[in-house]
């Protein structure tokens, strides 16, 4: 998500980490071929345009409700649900900073 869409979804104090920084972290992963920043409320347009082989979402999403699932699976791609890393999130980092002050 773009910085603008993160602000719309999470509030005016977000994001903490810029879209460029988030993109750099993702692009550094060897399993990532391409990073796209989007401002729409959901990624369907980007998924349709890029036609990824793999779409990954966290397990907090119902697999049937993953946006773009049909697009990816229709061309033989995979949709994966992976658990979030416990204890690591922007919300947790913000709370730690608040309690440290």
Regions found by a protein language model. Name each.
Residues 1-101:
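Nucleotidyltransferase catalytic core that binds NTPs
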């Amino acid at each position: 998500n773009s910085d603008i869409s993160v602000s719309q979804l999470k509030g005016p104090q977000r994001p903490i980490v810029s879209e460029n920084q988030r993109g750099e972290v993702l692009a550094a992963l060897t399993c990532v071929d391409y990073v796209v920043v989007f401002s729409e409320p959901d990624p369907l347009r980007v998924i349709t345009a890029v036609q990824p082989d793999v779409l990954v979402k966290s397990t907090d999403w119902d697999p049937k409700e993953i946006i773009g699932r049909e697009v990816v699976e229709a061309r033989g791609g995979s949709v994966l649900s992976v658990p979030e890393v416990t204890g690591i999130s922007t919300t947790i980092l913000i709370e730690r900073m608040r309690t440290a002050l």
